[in-house]
């Protein structure tokens, strides 16, 4: 079972940069997408359907902003849109597909980098999302929570930890939340198989950061502990360049 998560930073722009050809070549069973920046009616999905994918979409109310999707070659038993909290669901941040024996979520966590108001919103989200997952995990114990978390967990996950110590995405309280999230029954699938430094999933467009690999690892596929023994492989694909993020891959034994 191959699951990929990818913040495409605008699905329409990504398609013009060869996204569909890449998808055909990579051929995941399930693709979780974040930051669609489009309504489903605005995107020609005919080539996606032709590749054998069913498409599930949750866009934000605000045009050209946020939004998550799941493209799946396996028909889910159920698809759940949102997390049931209006202020987050209006921003298109959570989508879940339930399959036989496991569930996959595509999640786009808020960024706080634009200022204090959005940072406060992000901190509210983190607490509320944790409570939501605590309850969800009782009903759906086999969870893959894939997406853009907008947080680097540890110093190894960011190119300049000292210089970014006061930056949103690497604040002590955000990292503490991530530590708590993992301690409540989740495994960072990439770190389960790779403990090396200099593996990142997002790079600023400024100052040639990507070419110099001055990045942040803010995209994760978190796997609930009952599924952890099924992790076969996990990787990051920095050579794939339709976005300021790159895709992250998880292979699970069926």
For the regions a protein language model found, what residue spans apply to each?
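Metal-dependent phosphoesterases centered on the DNase I-like endonuclease/exonuclease/phosphatase
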Residues: 51-54, 127-214, 218
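Active-site beta-strand termini and strand-to-loop segments that position acidic
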Residues: 73, 97-100, 224-225, 250-254
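Structured beta-strand-rich core segments of catalytic domains in phosphoester-bond hydrolases
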Residues: 37-39, 44-112
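Conserved beta strand-loop-helix elements of the APE1-like EEP
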Residues: 63-78, 197, 209-229
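Active-site-proximal beta-strand elements of phosphoester/diester hydrolases
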Residues: 1-9, 101-113, 146
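Surface-exposed cleft-lining segments at the edges of enzyme active sites
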Residues: 84-85, 110-126, 162-166
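Active-site beta-strand/loop signature of hydrolases that rely on acidic residues for catalysis
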Residues: 7, 23-41, 104, 133-155, ...
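N-terminal, active-site-proximal structural segment of metallo-dependent hydrolase catalytic domains
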Residues: 1-50, 54, 60-66
């Amino acid at each position: 079972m191959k699951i990929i998560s990818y913040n495409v930073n605008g699905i329409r722009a990504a398609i013009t940069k060869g996204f569909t050809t890449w998808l055909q070549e990579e051929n995941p069973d399930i693709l979780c997408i974040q930051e669609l920046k489009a309504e489903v009616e605005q995107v020609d999905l005919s080539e996606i359907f032709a590749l054998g994918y069913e498409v599930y979409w949750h866009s934000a109310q605000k045009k050209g902003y946020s939004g998550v999707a799941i493209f799946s070659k396996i028909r889910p038993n159920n698809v759940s849109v949102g997390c049931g909290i209006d202020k987050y669901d209006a921003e298109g941040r959570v989508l879940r597909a339930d399959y036989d024996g496991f569930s996959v979520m595509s999640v786009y966590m808020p960024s706080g980098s634009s200022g204090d108001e959005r940072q406060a919103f992000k901190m509210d989200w983190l607490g509320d999302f944790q409570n939501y997952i605590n309850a969800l995990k009782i009903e759906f114990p086999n969870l893959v929570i894939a997406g853009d978390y907008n947080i680097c967990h540890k110093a190894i996950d960011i190119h300049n930890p000292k210089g970014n110590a006061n930056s949103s995405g690497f604040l002590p309280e955000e990292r503490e939340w991530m530590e708590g999230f993992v301690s409540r029954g989740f495994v960072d699938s990439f770190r389960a198989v790779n403990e090396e430094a200099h593996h990142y999933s997002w790079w600023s467009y400024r100052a040639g950061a990507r070419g110099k690999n001055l990045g942040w690892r803010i995209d994760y596929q978190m796997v609930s502990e009952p599924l952890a023994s099924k992790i076969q492989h996990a990787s990051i694909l920095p050579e794939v360049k339709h976005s300021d993020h790159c895709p992250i891959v998880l292979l699970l034994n069926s």
